C-alpha cells in the first residue's frame, strides 16, 4: 500500500530559486503601480517624523559601488523607520553644476568654451545633467531604493537656485561675505579657483633646489660676501620672490664652506649640509632671526632686492630656516607680505602660463619654467643643489592635475565670523562613528575662509552688481529678493541672458555715488555652496523638517557636504542643519585594494544586479561593518549568495509547512504549546528585540548575523528538523502539528518583517504567500518588538534549554561517529543510551520531555550508573549509539518495536496506523 499520500508534506508555490534578476523588476513594477511609497507615507502621516536628508550625487556617469553602498544604507534606515513608528519621507537629490559637466560637454562636442554663447553652452550642460539624472534614477531604483523619485530635488531647478540665492543673501547681510585679494588654490587645468574640499593629495615628482641670495646690504650684521640660502620645490615661483622670511626666535649661523659664506638656521645646518653636499662646515657667527630683520639680498636673476623679514610660520621641519617668500603664491607668504607691505606679484595667468611680469620666462607653462629657471640660477652661480623627490601634492579632484597657489581677487565666506558657533553646534550633533565629531571640529578649527567664487559659467551666479561709476559692489535685501524671485520664475539663465540694468530692481541706485548704471558679477558660486544650501532649498522649501534627523555620506564628506552644510546652516540659522551624522567607509576589492580599471578589480553594481539580483548586493551591504572601509569581490558576493539561499530556503520551508493553515482558526493558544515551542518563540522574540536594537543603532551587520543565525541554527538545524515528524506524520489537525505550525507562522511573520528593510524584494515575495495577512505589502506593516510573554519565558527557561542544547551538541558528535561507522543510516534508525557524568547534566536531561524527538532518534534511555566501556566519552556525558530495536515504519520511517502489531496496517507503527485509520481511510481504501 502507498502511504505517501497520507503524509502532510510541505507544499508551496513559493519558488526555491530566487531568479532575482528577472523577478525583482516585476516586483518593482508592482510597487510603482500601487504607488507603495505614497501608501507608506499615508499610513504613517500622523507619526513623528524621521528625515534622512539625501546628500546629492553628481549627475555624471553611471553609479559605482560607492553610490550603491551609500544609497542602500540610506534605504535600510528609511524603510526601517517607516516600520518602526515614524513618518519617514525620502527625497533623493542630484548635484548638477560645476566643472565636470562643462568638461564633458567640451570633450564630447569638441567645443571651445570661449567661442560659444554662454546660455547655449549652459543649455547643453543642463541637458547633459538631466540625461544622467534619468540614467542614475533608474539605476538607484533598480537597487530597490524607495523614495520620491518623481519629485527629486535638483540643484539646477529654479526654486532650488532661488533658495540658494537667499542663503547667500542672508550670509552677506550678516557680514560674512566679502571680496578680497587672497592666495587661493588655483587649478590651471580647470582655469578656476578651488576650495579646500575640491583638493585631493597625490604623489608628485618635483625638483628640490637650494639657492643662494647674495647679501646686498648687511645693515652692519652680514657682509656682502654672505649668501642667504633658501630651499624650494617650486622654482617657477622664484620670479615672484619679494623677500626671505626668518623666524624671530630661531638662531641663524653664518657658516664658511669651501671659501664661501652662507646663512642657515642653526637647527638645520646638519640636514642642509647633507643635502647640498657641504663638508668641513665652519661656524663664523650666530644671530637671532630678529637681529637680521631689514638685511637686503639681491634677487638671483632680477635687478631688485629681497629683504629679510620675520614670520612665525618659519619652522625647522625642512630646508634652511630661510624661507623663500612669494606673496602671490603662498598663503603664509601672502599674510607676512601684507604685514611688511611687500605688495603682491603673481606672474602666472589663469592657464598656468608665466606672464610678462616674469621677464625671460613669458609664455612658459609654470612647470616647464622650472627647468629654464634652474638653468638661469646655475648660470648665475646661485644654484647650490638640484635634485628630485616624490611627495604628496595637492591636485584638482576633478581633473586630477596639480594645482598651484595663486593670488587673485575672489569672493569669500568669512569662517572667522561664525567659527565659534560652528564648533559649538558640532557638540550638539550625534556623530556615528563618534570620532566624526573630532574630525570635523579639527577641520573647522583649522580652515581658512571659504573661497566661494569660481571662474566658470555652469553654476549659480554670485548675485552682486557693481556701480559702473565707482565700482561699489551692491548687495542688499532688495537686490537679493529681486534676483531670487527672478531665478524662481526663470532660472539662473536669466543672469546670463540679460544686461545688469535689466536685472536690478527698479529704482536701484548706488549707495555711494547715486549712479544707476550697473554691471554684474561674472563669477559663479562654488558647487559646495549649491549642495550646502540643500537644507534650505529642500527641507525648508518643502516644509519637511529642519534640522534633518540625519545626514549619511562617505567619510570624505567631512570636508565636503557635512562641512559646507554646517557652514551655511550655522551662518544663516545659528545651528547645524542635522541632528545626527553617520559616515561610512569606501568600497575596496577583496584584498583591500582601491578599485581601478588597470587592476581589473572593479565591481560594477549593475553587473552584480544583472547576474545575482539587487537583494544580494543589499545583503552584502548588510553584512559589512560599513563604518570602516569595506571589501567586495566575486568570491565575497558568492558567499553572500549562499547566505541568501539559506534564508530563502528557511522561508520556503516555513511557507510549505503552512499549507492549509488558517491563523484565524488553527492557531494554538500559548498556554497549550509545548515547552520546546515556547522556547523557540522566546528565541524569536529575543531575535526581534536584538534586531530592533541593532536597527536603532544602525548596526546592520548585527541584524544580518542575528537573522542568519536564527534561520540556520535555531530553526533549520534544530526546531524545524525536530518538527518534521510532527508536521508530516501527525494527524493534520492534531495539537502537536498545529502547535508547530503556530510557532512557524509567528516566526515567519517576525522574520519577514525583520528582513524587509534589507531584502525588500524577497520580503514582499514571501509576504504574498503568507496565509491570513491583510496588507498588500510587508512595507505597510510594523516591526515586531518581541512579545513580552515570550521574552519572560526566555528569562525563565533559557538557561535550561541552553544547557540542554550544549549536551545535544556533544551527543550529536557521538551520533556522527556512529553514522560514519555504519551503525545506522538515518538518525531515526538509532537509539541512545546516555550516561550523565555530572549532576547538572543529569538534572537537565531529567527536566526534558520527549528526548527521542529532541535528538531525532527512535529511542533514548538515560542511565544513572557508570558508562560501559564502549561508550563515547564526551564533555559532561557519555553515550552509546546503537541500532534501534524493532521494525522500520513504512510511513514515518522510524524504527519502533510496535511496527506490525496492527494487522490492517502491518508495515506501520501503531501511531501511524491510528492516524491513517482516523484521517486517511478514504485514501487507503
Curated annotation (Swiss-Prot):
Q: Name one GO biological process term.
A: isoleucyl-tRNA aminoacylation
Q: Where is motif 'KMSKS' region found?
A: 594-598
Enzyme Commission number, as recorded: 6.1.1.5
Pull one GO CC term from this UniProt entry.
Answer: cytosol
- This protein's source sits in the domain of life called Bacteria
CDD domains per UniProt: Anticodon_Ia_Ile_BEm, IleRS_core
Q: Which reaction does it catalyse?
A: tRNA(Ile) + L-isoleucine + ATP = L-isoleucyl-tRNA(Ile) + AMP + diphosphate
GO MF annotation, one = ATP binding
Q: Which residues does the annotation say bind L-isoleucyl-5'-AMP?
A: 553
Q: Where is this motif: 'HIGH' region?
A: 57-67
Cell division keyword on record: no
Instruction: Check the record and name the HAMAP family matching this protein.
Output: Ile_tRNA_synth_type1 (MF_02002)
Q: Which family does it belong to?
A: Belongs to the class-I aminoacyl-tRNA synthetase family. IleS type 1 subfamily.
The protein depicted here goes by the name: Isoleucine--tRNA ligase
> Taxonomic lineage of this organism?
Bacteria, Bacillati, Bacillota, Bacilli, Bacillales
